[in-house]
């Protein structure tokens, strides 16, 4: 109202300004015209010039009037255009205000319904619980990741220690092999030296034998030459034999000692070789044992993996069968529910119709009895008021007819009032149903909006029953629906296993 008053005042002000401008323009034009006439009067002296002046003045006046008419028309057109613009702006402002008011009103109604809706509050509580579950699952997953990383580090450490141990064992084997090779080379060199010594001794013995033969030959020659020296030669020969025997004894003793030493060295070499062989056999046995353990572990892991794969395949097959059974059961339950709903609606409609008919009969009977009682009461009241029994027959009949018409009029008024009351009750009930339908529609719209806003972020953590049916799932894309169906089938199969 205030905006309309302001707009009217603005239009009046614009109109006054336009009128003042027009009056100012006329005044200035008159002044110019008077000045022009004065100049013409001073300049024109002859009659011809006066006539010419009058003719020019008439032309000027006509031109001036024409310009004035055009200016007035332009002013009026401008004023009408401004008025139309103002009216259009006013209508637009009113329409914008109405739209804003309706929007605020709708938003307040929606907010009130959201705050008072038990269903939306329960949905928000379920979503909050889902967010908490997602947070807990994320924490558990993080702990599992840390645990897995720690196990991975421990396993890597164990593998590194095993590699270090194997490398140390290989290095020890290399060192033992090198020592064995050095001892073997030493033994070979020692045997070579012994062989050289034995060869040298044999050569010395052969030289001794050669010398002995030469001595024998000299002795024989000396014996032949000088019989006197025979005894001496014999003594020398005896001495030589003793020397040979002693040499043989010493040689035999040395040989025995050397053989004993060589046997001892051979025994030690053989013992070392046996020890090395036992170590190699033990190492190979340990390697074979590790290989057998590794092979057994690999076979066990392969068997376990195959078993788990078979279990997963069986579980997947059971999940698929369970999902198909659930789909069939869901379709069957849906059909049964639809049938039950239709039967229930039919029974409710039939029961409602019967109740309405019975109620209508009761109301009609009560209304009829009430009307009869009302008629009798009003007739009795009118009769008592007019004392009909004291009138003659004609007046009494006239009065009774008058009373009857009055009662019928009252009954008609009561019927009209009854009908009006029923119509008002029907309108109120319809209005209440409309408000309830509007409230349910807003609740459903807000519920779907909340689901679309949060469900994609909580996939895998949504509680059961948060979706009412396929209509809710159709709010999302195909990927979300497939993931949701798969997770629901997994949960159902896990429950079945448990």
UniProtKB/Swiss-Prot annotation:
Q: Name one GO cellular component term.
A: axoneme
* Subcellular location per the Swiss-Prot or TrEMBL entry: Nucleus; Cytoplasm, Cytoskeleton, Cilium axoneme; Cytoplasm, Cytoskeleton, Flagellum axoneme
Keywords for this protein? Cell projection, Cilium, Coiled coil, Cytoplasm, Cytoskeleton, Flagellum, Meiosis, Nucleus
Signal peptide per UniProt: none
Q: Which domain of life is it from?
A: Eukaryota
Q: Does Disulfide bond show up as a keyword for this record?
A: no
| InterPro entries on file | MNS1, TPH_dom
Q: Does this entry carry the keyword Nucleotide-binding? A: no
- Pfam families this protein is in? TPH
Q: List GO BP terms, alphabetically.
A: meiotic cell cycle
Query: What residue ranges carry the coiled-coil annotation?
Result: 45-211, 270-348, 385-450
* Entry similarity comment: Belongs to the MNS1 family.
Its job: Microtubule inner protein (MIP) part of the dynein-decorated doublet microtubules (DMTs) in cilia axoneme, which is required for motile cilia beating. May play a role in the control of meiotic division and germ cell differentiation through regulation of pairing and recombination during meiosis. Required for sperm flagella assembly. May play a role in the assembly and function of the outer dynein arm-docking complex (ODA-DC). ODA-DC mediates outer dynein arms (ODA) binding onto the axonemal doublet microtubules.
Query: Per its record, how is this protein called by name?
Result: Meiosis-specific nuclear structural protein 1
Q: From which organism does this entry originate?
A: Xenopus tropicalis (Western clawed frog)
